């Protein structure tokens, strides 16, 4: 059983080292460090020192393309999307979003540069978090059509025409869904393959939604990619009407069944941000449900209940963090 936590928002090494000691004291075995475009540009060597300190603390170091291109999960903004508006994603309505389209060869080349930088830190695993086409509703400033979807850029139109022999429609239908899924799978195969050639290990986290959901990816096809070594999902139940037993239990069962079939370990993420006061004990329940369900890797997002990031801070981050440490000890001792 491997137990981890996401860590971000601090690049001052002596403070990171103190936090790493705290992470060890809370019964973690690995840390998922975010590595945004800003980190790649300005903190590359610093991140190498942070990864080295992580190893010195006896922890494994994972690294996450946090918000890179806007294609992966995370609050970090994308400089790439701002620099190259011609490669931004275009909605079916014709509006553009500040997100890069993974179908542009130039963006894929930029992702290979990210892989080079990430591996140069000495990280043990590259963590590909929630790869997706843009979801308009996630932008709090978006007030356009509720049924708009991405992407309808020049690259997507060309590739759709090549694939289906017709123009990319403005209405989202089964053909569009299949096209989007195929292209994201191709993108993931490309970047994980590039990393693996250089000796990198890849972990993939997909949203806990149905394969046929508009924003879903087929789990089996994604998990079975030859250079995906660990597969998981992030059933954050505070955003649902479900209990942790229900949501975490159902999604853990789904992921573990698949991973056992294809012979890969499972990772389950537990929500440790935006936790309401008085519900912190649900985190322990979620950890125990994931462990009992057979997940080999569990991780919490994020360190110290995300108390340092006001937009997603838990109401009582110190209680959240204490709950994680106690639950991790129990599942590791079981």
Predicted features along the sequence, with ranges:
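Aromatic-lined carbohydrate-recognition surfaces of secreted/lumenal glycan-active proteins
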Residues: 4-9, 62-66, 126-131, 172-216, ...
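Aromatic-lined substrate-binding rim segments of carbohydrate-active enzymes
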Residues: 19-82, 176-196
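Substrate-binding cleft of secreted/luminal carbohydrate-active enzymes
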Residues: 235, 240, 267-332
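Active-site-adjacent "subsite" loops/lids of carbohydrate-active enzymes
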Residues: 62-121, 170-177, 189, 281-283
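Catalytic domains of carbohydrate-active enzymes, especially glycoside hydrolases
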Residues: 9-40, 120-125, 224-231, 289-298
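Substrate-binding cleft/loops of secretory-pathway carbohydrate-active enzymes
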Residues: 136, 191-245, 274-293
């Amino acid at each position: 059983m491997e137990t981890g936590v996401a860590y971000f928002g601090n690049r001052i090494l002596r403070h990171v080292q103190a936090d790493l000691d705290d992470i060890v004291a809370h019964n973690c075995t690995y840390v998922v460090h975010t590595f945004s475009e800003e980190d790649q540009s300005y903190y590359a060597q610093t991140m190498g020192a942070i990864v080295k300190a992580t190893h010195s603390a006896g922890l494994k170091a994972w690294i996450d393309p946090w918000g890179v291109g806007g294609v992966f999960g995370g609050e970090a903004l994308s400089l790439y999307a701002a620099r190259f508006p011609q490669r931004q994603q275009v909605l079916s309505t014709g509006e553009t979003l500040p997100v890069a389209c993974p179908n542009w060869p130039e963006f894929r080349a930029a992702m290979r540069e990210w892989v080079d930088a990430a591996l140069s830190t000495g990280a043990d695993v590259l963590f590909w978090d929630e790869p997706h086409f843009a979801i308009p509703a996630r932008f709090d400033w978006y007030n356009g059509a509720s049924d708009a979807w991405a992407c309808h850029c020049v690259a997507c139109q060309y590739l759709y025409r090549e694939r289906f022999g017709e123009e990319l429609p403005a209405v989202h239908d089964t053909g569009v869904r299949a096209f989007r899924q195929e292209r994201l799978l191709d993108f993931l195969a490309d970047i994980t393959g590039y990393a693996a050639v250089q000796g990198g290990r890849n972990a993939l986290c997909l949203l806990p939604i149905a394969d046929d959901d508009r924003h879903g990816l087929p789990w089996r096809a994604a998990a079975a990619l030859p250079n995906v070594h660990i597969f998981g999902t992030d059933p954050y139940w505070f955003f649902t009407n479900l209990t942790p037993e229900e949501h975490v239990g159902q999604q853990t069962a789904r992921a573990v069944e698949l991973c056992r079939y294809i012979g890969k370990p499972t990772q389950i993420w537990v929500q440790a941000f935006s936790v309401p006061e008085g519900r912190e004990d649900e985190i322990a329940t979620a950890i125990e449900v994931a462990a009992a369900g057979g997940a080999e890797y569990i991780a919490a997002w994020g360190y110290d209940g995300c108390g340092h990031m006001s937009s997603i801070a838990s109401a009582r981050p110190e209680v959240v963090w204490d709950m994680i440490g106690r639950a991790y000890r129990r599942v590791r001792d079981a």
